[in-house]
Amino acid sequence: MKQEIYMAREIETKCIHLEEEENSINHYGAISYPIYQSATYAHPVVGQSTGYDYSRLQNPTREHLEKTVASLENGIDALAFSSGMAAITLMMELFKPGDHLIVDADLYGGSIRLFNHVSEKNGIEFSSVDCHKENVAAYIRENTKAVYIETPTNPMMNVTDIKALAEITKKHNILLIVDNTFLSPYFQNPLDLGADIVVHSGTKYLGGHNDTLAGFLVTNREDISERFRFLIKTTGAGLAPFDCFLIQRGIKTLGVRMDRAQENAIEIAKWLKEQDIVKKVVYPGFKEHPGYEIMKKQARGFGAMLTFELTKKEYAINILEKVRMIKYAESLGGVETLITYPMTQTHADVPEHIRKQNGITDCVLRMSVGIENVKDLLNELKEVFAEVRGE
């Protein structure tokens, strides 16, 4: 009954409160879950454990965080890693030489680099497919084991119908893996839509403060959970206790941060659309976005990420060099507003023909909108754009 009551709680509450049993007086009544900064644990007698033996295997602080993330994604298990790429790297251990994966054509550059330069070397084959518009079933082979997508994608904000894709993957008995970093569990839960594994860069919205690195794998399948647990203890890729504490603290404000950032993003996207030096603004919250209706159906919000294309490369470069409060930096999902240049940053290692195919030109900028007062953000953008125009 207690578990049913907990699961019925709204996500804002679940961000702050795990089950009462997990916040019990056993921790001296601490409201903030303690940091167990210990590498190893004493045994009371031979053959008996406290439940923890060595922090590479498990640590109470990490376990608490993992239970929180699992609850937010409605999964049976979540595992915390030292970074998002560490999580994806371990996930690839599910596959063996000769296996084939279908991956979205528009992905984070780090994922593409891993697949092209590490996984392929290990004998895994990939097909790059525009999963939001192509018939994925046409690319499935006898040795296909999984489909890997982001939705929305990084950086072009393409949207894939998760439920429709899950029907295809289940029909062919292959895995559906969804990177949910851009929307976070607050706005979207892929497992509820049929995905088997959810990936997060916890560095982004879950942590939310640009002060630590983390990654997560979440699943609702016991067999996958058991495999991941074996791999994380064997490889030692688990997240350290203090970093777990920082991510846990960040999650407590996930709801208010996501709401505020989205509000700001909508206002900024509208303003950008009106600028004569802006050729295109890509934001899934616009009705003209091809994925708008899908987003309304499968998500609870549109997020705070947007991409815009300037009419000239020089305009893009000048904007990056003239912003002050808004920072020209990689990453996303923090309280600060950041502008990124995918061409030389997040997607620098992506082959040129793929960048061109995805529309990532030297005029494209990606913005992660933060939670500052939107008036201040707009005032800075107005000043910067005026300088860029030479006004």
Please state what every model-predicted region is.
Residues K2, N116, E125-S127, R257, ...:
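PLP-dependent enzyme catalytic core of the Aspartate aminotransferase-like
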Residues K2-N59, L65-T68:
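N-terminal "arm"/small-domain region of PLP-dependent enzymes with the aminotransferase-like
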Residues I5-M7, E20-S24, A78-I277, V282, ...:
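Conserved PLP-enzyme active-site core in the AAT-like
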Residues E20-E22, Q37-H43, F182, K204, ...:
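Glycine-rich beta-alpha junction loops
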Residues T40-T89, E93-L94, G110-H117:
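Conserved N-terminal alpha-helix of the aminotransferase class I/II PLP-enzyme fold
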Residues T40-Y41, T219-D223, I251, L310-E314:
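Short loop segments at secondary-structure junctions
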Residues T235-G236, V323-G333, V384-E391:
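A common structural junction motif
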Residues K280-L365, V369:
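Conserved C-terminal alpha-helix-loop-beta "cap" of PLP-dependent enzymes
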